[in-house]
């Protein structure tokens, strides 16, 4: 065989062998599509933008909608950077875009599309909605948009919101975000500004939050340009996640021979400290720690610089004359006097009241011109003048104390060299850095001169041990490493065990007075002295029988025997003479007595305050920017002011009496009204119920349209000819620019006195003064400015509104047969009867129970108590401890005696049973408010009756509804002190009659003794 033939045979043999080897491998991969190594994997990415255009976004900046415009600039910059490309030379990335914007409604402005021009055109056309915030519904709609796409692409959503919500009708943000993640959608959370609710953003973002939240913002801090870094980081994360999901190696790979063993590498440098983990769930409350040792006395402070003598102040203006005091109610009926002798014939009675005016007569002839009249009385003080000129700048203050060291900021750009500053104090020692890697050995330097001795460094405080972070995700299993070199010396160990006790410290401050509990039995005393002689002993036993004595004398006659039975009835006797007249009988009830009894029974004859023919309309802001708590304060303000105006017209269509209406508004089409002529509003209680039923709308702010609505629906349709019309408008002065600002003066020039109250909103934005003055018909003196909504319910401001709306009240008393003079109460005080209902159940605990009754004693000591039971001012207090349905203990009834209160509290015993608040309320009404004997009212009729509940609300529900109705019938003003974190808010709201402002929440019973809480409680009660 030739050599050429042998080579051909060898090549044919190798080819046959290769085919035999590859056929099984090809059969193994027949079920999967094979991609050659040169092809690129398609990786389509869909990005959906979810934009919050609610009022909480629109009103954060001035002008309104500027923040929404920045968002509309951010997204085009984002879209411009999304280019189709081959990523990592492995996958071919293509992009699709879609989006929606939302408030309390959702509008899809663009479905998913590949055209950038089409998407951006639709984006520029959107306008902010400016209403409530329902983020959960927006995420739900976004998820549905992705579900309608059949393509198996990588899905991302960019949610731009501040994290605040006004409602969750679609199940909540957290649930909808988890549902989206289950569908394979990854959500990025981007903040439009710095005013955000971070926890809400973290609920939206997919885990890990370091990747999908990572402090993404539309604009950098304290800047107006778009944050390019945020865009680049999000796009980089999208590409990386898409690559990991799309790229799958399908080429045939044959493992090569193992390479030679590598050299041992250098020891790596110590890694940087990881970022702190997310805060863990709130743990249970720990046990109280042991009392620490008394600290060493601190160093004496440096004496401060003496201030300069101030300038002599100018003489103050003479104050305006005080307002007339309010007439008090009649005193209670005195004891029945003795019957007096008949009086002499009385003098002729006083002239009776003038009759009703007759019909108007015919117009008479013009009379002669009269003489010039006397000069009129001086008029009322005018409104306060405009503010004076701005004063000269004040003297610079003393330099302040050095503040604590701030956190290390980002490295700034190199600025121009500044002037040489004064030498600063020695800096605080920095944190210990990680150990660096060994550097290259340098050349030996020349010995330098000996330096001066350095200043001793300040000893730093030991830092507190940080919270344990959450465990990170499990990493991939690493290869088995080779044995390492001997490690460097470790850091110092943890703190050693506690040392021995130090020397005794200085004598501590005098402790608080202790509780008067009986102490342990004392030691046995010394032997006493000899006692007094004991009492005479008992009779001894009989002695022996004596000898027989002599016969005695005859005894005295015995007692007569018993009386015999009566005999038979005798015949009737003759008629006797006529008797003398008997004494005169008691006089019957007079008309005075009857009317007094009726007055004491039903209170229908009391004097009442009348403000004349008066129509008052309140226009209150119910938009999202106000907030739920502030809206509740607005309603309380309306109720408190109307309560000061006395009775309201029983017939809304009558020409006399006061009528009240309310308009609450948000965005267009959401206005709600309590009309002036509503037939259901015929008493103060019915008006209060109608106001309490108003619900927070939480939408946009269309103030001009609301004012026009108020005039058309409340004033124009039901106006009375002789009635004075007042309007009180509560707003921050800002409104939606889409509204017609010409309607700001809708109430002007129509014989309506408009008073405007301007208050900042929940974003701490100041009120708009120019708008407020326009609403008040360009009368600045009728504009009241406040910083907080809580100032609305302050007693001083309520007094001011009362004088403004009803400057000349008329006190009308019924014409009774016997009238008494009115007892005028002090203006600075008012009568109040307070009944404390203290929960004595086992949930409270004995220690907390004693803290609670000590709080009651402190309240009694702080309040000005009445001088007697019929005192027309000041306070009386009662206390009821309750447990189960049949366990109620009246510790002390309504009393003004502080000694009686202290003695009763010293003897109180903890029930330690279950809890039933309904039975306790009924028992308090039947045994404290009313007399248990005859059912007469013990609480003073002219006093406010206040129930103070000290409970957590976790109680039995039996008789609760009946008890609430009984409270309403007795006109009880409830106050709830809820202590601890585990409370039943539904029960607390029922006890507070739906008024959240009447519920005081504190973390524990120790807070009862804190001055801040105690002062708030006293101001609320009084």
UniProtKB/Swiss-Prot annotation:
Region (Triple-helical region): 256-590
Positions of region (Nonhelical region): 28-255, 591-1022
Compositionally biased region (Basic and acidic residues): 306-318, 363-377
UniProt-annotated stretches for the region Disordered: 263-587
Coiled coil, from the record: none
Glycosylated residues in this chain: 141, 215, 327, 630, 897
Leader sequence residues: 1-27
Biased composition, class Gly residues, residue ranges: 534-543
Ranges where the VWFA domain occurs: 44-168, 613-738, 833-957
UniProt record, GO biological process: cell adhesion
Location of region: Interruption in collagenous region: 514-519
Subcellular compartments: Secreted, Extracellular space, Extracellular matrix
GO cellular component, one term: collagen trimer
Motif (Cell attachment site): 348-350, 366-368, 426-428, 444-446, 465-467, 489-491, 498-500
One Pfam match: VWA
Keywords: Cell adhesion, Collagen, Extracellular matrix, Glycoprotein, Hydroxylation, Repeat, Secreted, Signal
Post-translational modification: Prolines at the third position of the tripeptide repeating unit (G-X-Y) are hydroxylated in some or all of the chains.
Task performed by this protein: Collagen VI acts as a cell-binding protein.
Family note: Belongs to the type VI collagen family.
Assembly description: Trimers composed of three different chains: alpha 1(VI), alpha 2(VI), and alpha 3(VI).
Listed name of the protein: Collagen alpha-2(VI) chain
Species for this entry: Gallus gallus
């Amino acid at each position: 065989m030739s050599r050429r033939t042998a080579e051909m045979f060898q090549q044919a043999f190798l080819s046959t062998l290769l085919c035999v080897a590859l056929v099984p491998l090809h059969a193994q991969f027949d079920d999967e599509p094979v991609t050659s190594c040169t092809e690129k994997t398609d990786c389509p990415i869909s990005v959906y933008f979810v934009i919050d255009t609610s009022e909480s976004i629109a009103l954060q900046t001035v002008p309104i909608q500027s923040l929404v415009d920045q968002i509309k600039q951010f997204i085009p910059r984002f879209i411009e950077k999304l280019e189709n490309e081959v990523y990592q030379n492995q996958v071919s990335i293509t992009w699709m875009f879609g989006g929606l914007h939302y408030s309390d409604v959702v509008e899809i402005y663009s479905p998913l599309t590949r055209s950038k021009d089409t998407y951006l055109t639709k984006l520029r056309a959107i306008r902010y909605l400016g209403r409530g915030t329902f983020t959960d519904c927006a995420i739900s709609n976004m998820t549905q948009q992705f579900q309608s796409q059949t393509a198996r692409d990588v899905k991302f959503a960019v949610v731009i919101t501040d994290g605040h919500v006004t409602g969750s009708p679609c199940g909540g943000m957290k649930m909808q975000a988890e549902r989206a993640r289950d569908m394979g959608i990854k959500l990025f959370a981007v903040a439009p500004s710095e005013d955000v609710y971070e926890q809400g953003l973290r609920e939206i973002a997919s885990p890990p939050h370091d990747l999908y939240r990572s402090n993404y913002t539309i604009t950098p801090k304290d800047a107006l340009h778009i944050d390019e870094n945020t865009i680049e980081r999000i796009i980089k994360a999208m590409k990386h996640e898409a690559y990991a999901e799309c790229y799958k190696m399908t080429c045939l790979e044959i493992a090569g021979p193992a390479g030679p063993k590598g050299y041992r590498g250098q020891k790596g440098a110590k890694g940087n400290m990881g970022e702190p983990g997310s805060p863990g769930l709130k743990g249970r409350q720990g046990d109280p720690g042991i009392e620490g040792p008394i600290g060493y006395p601190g160093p004496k402070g440096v004496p401060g610089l003496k201030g300069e003598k101030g300038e002599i102040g100018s003489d103050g203006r003479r104050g305006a004359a005080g307002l007339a005091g309010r007439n008090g109610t009649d005193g209670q009926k005195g004891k029945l006097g003795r019957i007096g002798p008949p009086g002499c014939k009385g003098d002729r009675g006083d002239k009776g009241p003038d009759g009703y005016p007759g019909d108007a007569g015919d117009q008479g002839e013009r009379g002669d011109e009269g003489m010039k009249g006397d000069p009129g009385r001086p008029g009322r003080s005018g409104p306060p003048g405009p503010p004076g000129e701005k004063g000269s700048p004040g003297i610079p203050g003393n330099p302040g104390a050095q503040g604590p060291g701030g956190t290390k900021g980002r490295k700034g750009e190199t600025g121009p060299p500044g002037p040489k500053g004064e030498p600063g104090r020695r800096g605080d020692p920095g944190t210990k850095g990680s150990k660096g890697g060994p550097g290259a050995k340098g050349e030996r330097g020349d010995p330098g001169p000996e330096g001066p001795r350095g200043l001793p460094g300040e000893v730093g405080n030991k830092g507190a041990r940080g919270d344990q972070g959450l465990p990170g995700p499990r990493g991939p299993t690493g290869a088995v490493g080779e044995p390492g070199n001997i490690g460097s010396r470790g850091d110092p160990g943890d703190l050693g065990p506690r040392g021995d006790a130090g020397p005794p410290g200085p004598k501590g401050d005098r402790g608080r007075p202790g509780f008067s509990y009986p102490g342990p039995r004392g030691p046995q005393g010394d032997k006493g002295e000899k006692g007094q002689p004991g009492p005479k002993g008992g009779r001894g036993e009989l002695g022996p029988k004596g000898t027989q004595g002599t016969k005695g004398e005859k005894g005295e006659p015995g007692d007569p025997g018993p009386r015999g039975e009566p005999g038979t009835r005798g015949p009737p006797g003759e008629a006797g003479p006529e008797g003398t007249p008997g004494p005169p009988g008691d006089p019957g009830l007079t008309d005075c007595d009857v009317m007094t009894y009726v007055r004491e029974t039903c209170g229908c004859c009391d004097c009442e305050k009348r403000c004349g023919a008066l129509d008052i309309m309140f226009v209150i802001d119910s938009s999202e920017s106000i907030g739920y708590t502030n809206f509740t304060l607005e309603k309380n303000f309306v109720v408190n002011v109307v309560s000061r105006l006395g009775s309201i017209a029983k017939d809304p269509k009558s020409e006399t009496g006061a009528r009240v209406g309310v308009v609450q508004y948000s965005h267009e089409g959401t206005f709600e009204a309590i009309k002036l002529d509503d037939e259901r509003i015929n008493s103060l209680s019915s008006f209060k119920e109608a106001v309490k039923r108003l619900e927070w709308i939480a939408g946009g702010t269309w103030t001009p349209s609301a004012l026009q609505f108020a005039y058309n629906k409340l004033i124009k349709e039901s106006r009375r000819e002789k009635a004075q019309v007042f309007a009180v408008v509560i707003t921050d002065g800002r409104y939606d620019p889409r509204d017609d600002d010409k309607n700001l003066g809708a109430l002007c020039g129509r014989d309506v006195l408009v008073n405007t109250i301007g208050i900042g909103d929940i974003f701490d934005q100041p009120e708009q003064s120019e708008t407020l003055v326009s609403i008040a018909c360009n009368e600045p003196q009728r504009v009241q400015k406040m910083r907080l909504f809580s100032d609305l319910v302050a007693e001083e401001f309520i007094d001011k509104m009362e004088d403004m709306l009803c400057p000349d009240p008329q006190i009308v008393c019924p014409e009774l047969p016997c009238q008494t003079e009115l007892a005028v109460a002090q203006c600075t005080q008012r009568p109040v009867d307070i009944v404390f209902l203290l929960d004595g159940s086992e949930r409270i605990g004995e220690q907390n129970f004693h803290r609670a009754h000590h709080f009651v004693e402190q309240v009694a000591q702080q309040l000005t108590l009445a001088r007697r039971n019929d005192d027309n001012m000041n306070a009386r207090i009662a206390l009821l401890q309750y447990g189960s349905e049949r366990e109620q203990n009246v510790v002390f009834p309504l009393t003004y005696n502080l000694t009686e209160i202290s003695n009763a509290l010293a003897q109180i015993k903890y029930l330690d049973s279950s809890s039933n608040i309904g039975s306790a309320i009924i028992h308090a009404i039947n045994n404290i408010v009313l007399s248990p004997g005859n059912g007469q009212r013990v609480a003073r009729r002219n006093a406010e009756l206040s129930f103070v509940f000290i409970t957590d609300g976790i109680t039995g529900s039996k008789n609760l509804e009946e008890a609430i109705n009984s409270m309403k019938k007795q006109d009880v003003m409830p106050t709830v002190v809820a202590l601890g974190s585990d409370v039943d808010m539904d029960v607390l709201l029922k006890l507070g009659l739906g008024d959240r402002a009447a519920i005081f929440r504190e973390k524990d019973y120790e807070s009862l003794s804190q001055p801040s809480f105690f002062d708030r409680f006293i101001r609320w009660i009084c």
